């Protein structure tokens, strides 16, 4: 435990030297983020451990002691290229291997670890050029990004406080506690122009200032890690790969606003993120960076993790606070805002995971360094999770002002064969769908707001021409109606009724009157709902009505332009292929298929519910959806 800042600085300098020595030796880094783990990364890690032990090559894994002539095996966090995992990086050669299987491990040890030879078949494929590239930093995927908070890709240890300190970790905390007043810290954050990364984009420095000036002897700091958007996993990635970065930001925030206690509210569905953050808290306490009298400065601050039960509405700050208090997660009207009356009625600062992660580097590298990225009103970078039929998907970090075209084509490599661009859904289930007209629009808070869209937490779903936009709206509204807390009528009842109307569209039963009702109802929900969930729930409907209205009209006229909605199609049996085996008839739950054995069967369209079971059972592929 460090008694003062001087002891910490001496320790940090020692660790920096040791880490440099380690990276110059042979080190293996296996990505154990959730994406790679789902594809077998832990088995790959175990295979390396077993192989190195068998050859007596496994060295000490901490920076405190590095065994010469040995190989260090490390767990690293998400590298961003989740679609190519499991990922492995070999230092000092910087070879970056993708889709690694346990069976590849002996060859990697033989050729790369012992001889320094590359294995070309394991190289990462550049999504833009299609070429095999030995090092991730040489790919267009990497070059077209700006890793401001996602530093040290593939060569940091997600479970080591020593590694974080060796990467200049906690230096900003030392600087804040020993040479800055709380007011100076807040002014620095205000000058940086940092805006909340949780979706609203409220100026972070102003929020800190409000909390600092709020009356009260007891104050709290809360981290909103309740990332509930389908397909969004930026917060999870940060908490898994660099938990101390978020923790350091929270401690600095506690000092700046005058708080004594903090809570990290993390989804229970993120078990690895919860585990990493709890370990980070424990390790920081052991070194005296958290708890009583931090670094002998007289400042005391402690943290604990509160696991969320999974309700999407708990991403709303007042619902989140209610959940921490042990109550049902339900939003309340504002004002008073949490900065005035939050946890147990005390002034409370709430920021997103990514917001806190920016703080240490802003204090360490300065405001000018931060503001050279992004745009005037949206400085800095933003992490996005990109999903869809692209050549590369996963987590990216880009400057604000980057266009959708850059993300889709210059970073993710464009579409897989047979797919064409149609739209982008940005901002999660509460976000908007944007057409191709917006593909060159800079992504920042103000520009997206003008387009009736939002950054949200950073989820980007790329949609192709094979997808029905009415179905997209129905899908997202199905999610938000289920996640409504039920407190206010516009959200509880309105989303249900809007969903029922969308069901009529996708089932071929909608009328022009339904179209009129849907639009009016959506605007009413947006205006009259109590909290952000209800106010933004109709966004997918309103944006698709605005930009893809012709698809709604086509559904009324009896056609789904994308061919996705099966209600506008029918299953038919091709008499030239059908052998008359009767297997389809026996599998039909509606008894809609009849015929004489040995002759072609037919389907009664009045009885058919288009379940597709008959087509899946037919061994001759005689049943088609037309």
From Swiss-Prot:
Which residues hold FMN?
207, 224-228, 312-317, 350-352
Instruction: Give the E.C. number(s).
Output: 1.12.1.4
Cofactor descriptive note: May bind 1 [2Fe-2S] cluster per subunit. May bind 3 [4Fe-4S] cluster per subunit.
Q: Which SUPFAM superfamilies match?
A: 4Fe-4S ferredoxins, Nqo1 FMN-binding domain-like, Nqo1 middle domain-like, Nqo1C-terminal domain-like, Thioredoxin-like
Respond yes or no to whether keyword Membrane is given for this record.
no
Binding positions for [4Fe-4S] cluster 2?
578, 581, 584, 588
Q: Which reaction does it catalyse?
A: 2 H2 + 2 oxidized [2Fe-2S]-[ferredoxin] + NAD(+) = 2 reduced [2Fe-2S]-[ferredoxin] + NADH + 3 H(+)
Alphabetized Gene3D superfamilies for the sequence: 3.10.20.600, 3.30.70.20, 6.10.250.1450, Glutaredoxin (3.40.30.10), NADH-ubiquinone oxidoreductase 51kDa subunit (3.40.50.11540), NADH-ubiquinone oxidoreductase 51kDa subunit, iron-sulphur binding domain (1.20.1440.230)
The residues that hold [4Fe-4S] cluster 3 are 608, 611, 614, 618
Group of enzyme by EC:
oxidoreductase
**Which keywords does the record carry?**
4Fe-4S, Cytoplasm, Flavoprotein, FMN, Iron, Iron-sulfur, Metal-binding, NAD, Oxidoreductase, Repeat
Chief place of localization: cytoplasm
Chain ranges of the 4Fe-4S ferredoxin-type domain: 569-598, 599-626
Any Gene Ontology CC annotation: cytoplasm
Q: Which cofactor does it need?
A: [2Fe-2S] cluster; [4Fe-4S] cluster; FMN
Role played = Catalyzes the oxidation of the physiological electron carriers NADH and reduced ferredoxin, coupled to the production of H(2). Acts as a bifurcating [FeFe] hydrogenase, which uses the exergonic oxidation of reduced ferredoxin to drive the unfavorable oxidation of NADH to produce H(2). The beta subunit contains flavin- and NAD-binding sites and is potentially the site for NADH oxidation, with the subsequent shuttling of electrons to the alpha subunit.
Quote the protein name from its UniProt record.
Answer: Bifurcating [FeFe] hydrogenase beta subunit
**Source organism per UniProt:** Thermotoga maritima (strain ATCC 43589 / DSM 3109 / JCM 10099 / NBRC 100826 / MSB8)
Q: Which gene encodes it?
A: hydB
């Amino acid at each position: 435990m460090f008694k003062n800042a001087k002891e910490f600085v001496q320790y940090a300098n020692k660790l920096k030297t040791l880490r440099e020595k380690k990276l110059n030796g042979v080190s293996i880094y296996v990505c154990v983020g959730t994406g790679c783990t789902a594809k077998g990364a832990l088995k790959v890690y175990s295979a390396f451990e077993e192989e190195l032990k068998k050859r007596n090559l496994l060295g000490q894994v901490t920076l405190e002691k590095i065994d010469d002539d040995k190989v260090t095996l490390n767990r690293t966090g998400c590298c961003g290229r989740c679609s190519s995992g499991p990922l492995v990086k070999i230092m000092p050669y910087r070879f970056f291997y993708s889709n690694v299987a346990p069976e590849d491990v002996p060859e990697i040890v033989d050729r790369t670890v012992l001889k320094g030879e590359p294995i070309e078949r394991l190289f990462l494929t550049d999504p833009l050029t299609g070429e095999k590239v030995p090092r991730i930093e040489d790919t267009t995927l990497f070059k077209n990004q700006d890793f401001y908070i996602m530093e040290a890709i593939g060569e940091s240890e997600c479970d080591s406080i020593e590694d974080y300190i060796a990467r200049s970790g906690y230096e900003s905390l030392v600087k804040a506690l020993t040479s800055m007043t709380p007011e100076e810290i807040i002014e620095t954050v205000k000058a940086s122009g940092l805006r909340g990364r949780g979706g609203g984009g409220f100026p972070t420095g102003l929020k800190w200032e409000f909390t600092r000036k709020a009356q009260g002897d007891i104050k709290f700091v809360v981290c909103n890690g309740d990332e509930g958007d389908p397909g969004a996993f930026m917060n999870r990635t940060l908490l898994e790969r660099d938990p101390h970065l978020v923790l350091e930001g929270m401690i600095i925030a506690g000092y700046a606003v005058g708080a004594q206690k903090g809570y990290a509210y993390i989804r229970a569905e993120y078990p690895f993120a919860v585990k990493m953050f709890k370990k980070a808290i424990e390790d920081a306490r052991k070194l005296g960076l958290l708890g009583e009298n931090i670094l002998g400065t007289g400042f005391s601050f402690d943290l604990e993790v509160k696991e969320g039960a999974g309700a999407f509405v708990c991403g709303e700050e007042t619902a989140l606070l209610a959940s921490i208090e042990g109550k049902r997660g339900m939003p309340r009207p504002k004002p008073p805002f949490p900065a005035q009356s939050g946890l147990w009625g005390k002034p409370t600062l709430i920021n997103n995971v990514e917001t806190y992660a920016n703080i240490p580097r802003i204090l360490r590298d300065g405001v000018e360094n931060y503001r050279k990225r992004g745009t005037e009103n949206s400085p800095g970078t933003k992490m996005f999770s990109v999903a869809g039929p692209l050549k590369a998907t996963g987590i990216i970090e880009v400057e604000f002002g980057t266009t959708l075209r850059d993300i889709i084509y210059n970073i993710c490599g464009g579409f897989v064969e047979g797919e064409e661009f149609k739209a982008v859904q940005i901002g999660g289930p509460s976000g908007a769908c944007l057409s191709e007209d917006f593909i060159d629009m800079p992504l920042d808070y103000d520009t997206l707001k003008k387009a009736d869209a939002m950054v949200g937490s950073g989820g980007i779903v790329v949609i192709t021409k094979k997808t029905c936009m009415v179905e997209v709206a129905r899908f997202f509204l199905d999610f938000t109606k289920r996640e409504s807390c039920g407190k206010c009528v516009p959200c509880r009842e309105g989303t249900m009724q809007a969903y029922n109307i969308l069901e009529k569209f996708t089932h071929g039963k909608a009328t022009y009157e339904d179209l009129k009702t849907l639009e009016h109802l959506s605007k009413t929900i947006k205006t009259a709902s109590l909290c952000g969930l209800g106010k933004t729930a109709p966004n997918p409907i309103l944006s698709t009505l605005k930009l893809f209205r012709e698809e709604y009209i086509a559904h009324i006229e009896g056609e789904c332009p994308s061919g996705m909605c099966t209600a506008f199609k029918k299953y038919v049996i091709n008499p030239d292929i059908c052998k008359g085996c009767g297997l389809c008839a026996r599998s039909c739950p509606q008894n809609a298929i009849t015929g004489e054995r040995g002759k072609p069967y037919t389907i009664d369209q009045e009885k058919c519910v288009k379940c597709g079971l008959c087509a899946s059972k037919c061994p001759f592929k005689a049943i088609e959806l037309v």
